[in-house]
Amino acid sequence: MARHGRIPTFDVWRIGVFVLMAAVFLAALAAAMSPPPREMDAASLPRDTSVRQLGGSFVHQFAGKYDETNWLKSDFYYPNSDHPAWKAGLVHFKRDRLELEVRRQKTAYKAIAGGELQRRGFYHFGRYEVVMQAAPGSGTVSAMFTHTHKQFGDPHDEIDIEFLGKDLTRMHANYFTDGKQHGSIYIPLGFDASKQIHLYAFEWDPDEIRWYVDDRLVHTARPSDFPIPQAPGRLMLHLWSGGRDQVSWAGEPT
């Protein structure tokens, strides 16, 4: 499928109905929650046998079942990071959708836990799509993105589609090349991304990135602006809320 591609071998990584939902806007965590996630450092992040395998085109419809062959629930935390703990118990597979949850928790290691799902293997140039409904609430961040980092022996390259719960009338397009953030822009949507499901996408070429909303081109990044990421990355879906250092960006958690 190469509706908007400019390179002949244009792959499509498409995900089906994907709903990001914050539970009662970061409600208190129930006491019966699953055991705490593991502490991780850069050398001991979750890995699998497909970690350096480049994946091919796929269309995945989340429909009530956890496909462990192709997906991995994150269940770890960084001890010295402003990011939350990632807990497998906050990734829910419903009959016709995936739901990710973020919650407050009273523990010694993190104040907030979020849900994250990773696609196994690595993916490169192509079109990435997600059909999703973002989570409302100040402090929440709903995202689909590609990512790699030093734990995989790579530079920090990343391409983001993000929604801040404090203002869901805008989409945040953003990317990193070799650890440097580039091209951060907030794109008006003309609707509230938490009210209904929409199709969001980006097309990643060696020399350009294009972002789409409901198949409408809304932003383009070119190397004349900043360097384009080149390293293959993991495909990630997550919902989170950060610590104090993130408040000026994402808002005060509800």
Question: What kind of region is each of these model predictions?
Answer:
Residues 3-4, 10-16, 27-254:
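GH16 jelly-roll
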